């Protein structure tokens, strides 16, 4: 028996959210998906509201993961404690709302899902993810584990993947909003993709209005970034896990769709 997991890249803005609502169920049917994990931390541009979380779960996501914008929308804080299907990075302070990993029932039995935040080139430094994952894996002992590593640096993501090779079933990256083409199965059986990409506006600079990004690089930006308008795409990857080996047997990059549009 095998488990087919669809991991969807960062949902950006209302356009990305509508794209997810319009296409997720058909993609799940097309790829015969058993379990779906969606990174939702940019649904508000930066951050996530309870209403947006509910919309993504209603659209077909089983689990939502977050990242460095986990608490940008204060109204999500209480919701993180109440909803077991949303994970914020496990290497944030334990006193903060929510949880960073969990065990979830699937057709092959319980599976561990973990959310971690990288430390390179980010505005703040969470606890060391390499040390935190050691503690998490002890609690998830014996289970297939899937990791969303929300990080900026490719080197940090690759180092984590080789550190966990043979210890978890798969690791995918989020945060950069650019899908990579380096899908691979590492020597000891762990599946890896540096970044899933984003679910959001095509004609944008990683999801935001190009003119705002240009102004920023010219040293002229005076307003907050806003998600771009126009056609959107959904990006992610399908991971197929064999129940006996509990390691990845196949990676397939899901085909983007550009039919959703928000103006």
Question: Can you say where each PLM-predicted feature lies in the sequence?
Answer:
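Active-site-proximal beta-strand elements of phosphoester/diester hydrolases
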Residues: 3-9, 110-118, 146-148, 193
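Divalent metal-coordination and catalytic microenvironments
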Residues: 10, 64, 114, 146, ...
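Conserved beta-sheet core of the metallophosphoesterase superfamily
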Residues: 35, 55-66, 78-89, 154-227
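N-terminal active-site segment of His-dependent metallophosphoesterases
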Residues: 1-54, 100, 127-128, 135-138
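Single conserved hydrophobic/aromatic residue that forms the stacking wall/gate
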Residues: 251-263
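Active-site-proximal segments of metal-dependent phosphoesterases and phosphodiesterases across multiple
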Residues: 40-56, 118-127, 135-176
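Binuclear metal-dependent hydrolase catalytic cores centered on His/Asp/Glu-rich metal-binding motifs
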Residues: 26-27, 97-144
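Glycine/small-residue-rich loop that forms an oxyanion/phosphate-binding "nest" at active or ligand-binding sites
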Residues: 70-106, 113, 123
